[in-house]
């Protein structure tokens, strides 16, 4: 058995669940009476999605439907970074929603500092878009997981734990 144990802290989401969520949102928008004639389009790209609709009111309704469907499919709402809506031709409104994936250097440094300050028995290493936490005792790693979970709202990113060994 290894003398040290470790796990990775990552910020990721299941892309297929997002695709399924958007399918549900499109279906809901096309059948809902107040949104049926709004000609709403939702386009998913690699790092963002674009919502184009008729007015601010319908845009807000589509956002509400998106949040509700994402929550039901266990997607964190923190993956959505709603940008400012822009007016496009033909009295339509377009909103870009950036999808957060991976830990930025700034957030990784904050997370690393939080863990180092609170827990002395673990070591923290930033590895690209993830943070590896290593310790001799699995109890120390469990304490680190609890600490990171408690600080997740402060960091404003969805966090998952992988490669626990």
UniProtKB/Swiss-Prot annotation:
Pfam assignment, any one: DUF520
Lineage: superkingdom: Bacteria
Keyword S-adenosyl-L-methionine tagged: no
GO molecular function, one term: nucleotide binding
Disulfide bonds: none
Keyword tags: Nucleotide-binding
CDD domains from the UniProt entry: YajQ_like (cd11740)
Record bears the keyword Nucleotide-binding: yes
Coiled-coil portions: none
One Gene Ontology cellular component: cytosol
Function recorded in the entry: Nucleotide-binding protein.
Family: Belongs to the YajQ family.
Protein's name according to its UniProt entry: Nucleotide-binding protein Syncc9902_1708
Organism of this sequence: Synechococcus sp. (strain CC9902)
Lineage of source species: Bacteria, Bacillati, Cyanobacteriota, Cyanophyceae, Synechococcales
